[in-house]
A protein has these predicted regions:
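Signature of N6-adenine DNA methyltransferases within the class I
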Residues: 42-220
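Basic, amphipathic N-terminal segments
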Residues: 1-40, 45, 52-58
Length: 220
């Protein structure tokens, strides 16, 4: 019947895709060993209806924060391959799964915003989405994640379409009792100018207002 035919085609497609990837990697192990060790996941096979329509409407994620040198596998074909932490290629991969008018959100370490080591991922994100909203949170006295994670966090929200804008917040320091109200307190400030790949400052509304006043005064 049709269901069995579909399953057979899916199995054949998965096998041929695995064979192609195995050859591309020049892996000395057998195909079966490579599949067992790598556990390849083929998005277009697992979600055919999604990719017929161009990708996911919304992609939301919390990628792993792990130094590249500490993982025992390799990844290929990413513009962000040389980033120190694997959250960068995870951000890139997630973006590639999004449809042309889709929306995107990732929670990542604050290094995404300012570190030179992650300039490439900022360039990639800026080239893929038009509107960026980035909120930033300290780890003291409280943090979004448990203390063992030990990171200051940036929540990156983006969408495709519309004029290119970047909005950021100040670095929020907060107590645990504020957690349920934290997002209600967020204030974004639109960056007056920004360059693709450049660090995203976190001036906050008050400092931005002061800058604008100084600029206006000098223009008079």
């Amino acid at each position: 019947d049709f269901k069995r035919l579909l399953q057979r085609h899916e199995t054949e497609l998965r096998k041929s895709t695995n064979e192609t990837l195995h050859l591309m990697r020049s892996d000395p192990s057998s195909l079966d060993e490579w599949v067992t060790n790598s556990q390849p996941f083929h998005w277009f096979i697992e979600f055919p209806n999604v990719f017929i329509n161009g990708g996911f409407d919304v992609v939301v994620g919390n990628p792993p924060y792990i130094r590249k040198k500490n993982v025992d596998y390799k990844y290929y074909g990413y513009e962000t391959n040389n980033s120190r932490d694997i959250y960068a290629p995870c951000m890139e991969r997630a973006m590639s799964l999004m449809r042309g008018d889709g929306k995107y959100s990732m929670i990542v370490p604050i290094s995404f915003q300012f570190s030179e080591e992650y300039e490439k991922v900022r360039q990639y994100i800026a080239g893929e989405v038009s509107n960026l909203w980035i909120s930033t949170f300290s780890r003291n006295p409280s943090a979004l994640f448990p203390p063992a994670v030990g990171v200051r966090s940036s929540i990156v929200v983006g969408s495709r379409g519309g004029s290119a804008t970047v909005r950021t917040t100040r670095l929020y320091r907060w107590w645990e009792g504020m957690r349920q109200h934290l997002f209600d307190l967020i204030e974004y400030t639109e960056l007056i100018t920004f360059d693709s790949g450049a660090a995203y400052p976190r001036p906050g509304p008050a400092l931005t207002s002061l800058f604008e006043s100084l600029i206006a005064t000098r223009s008079c």
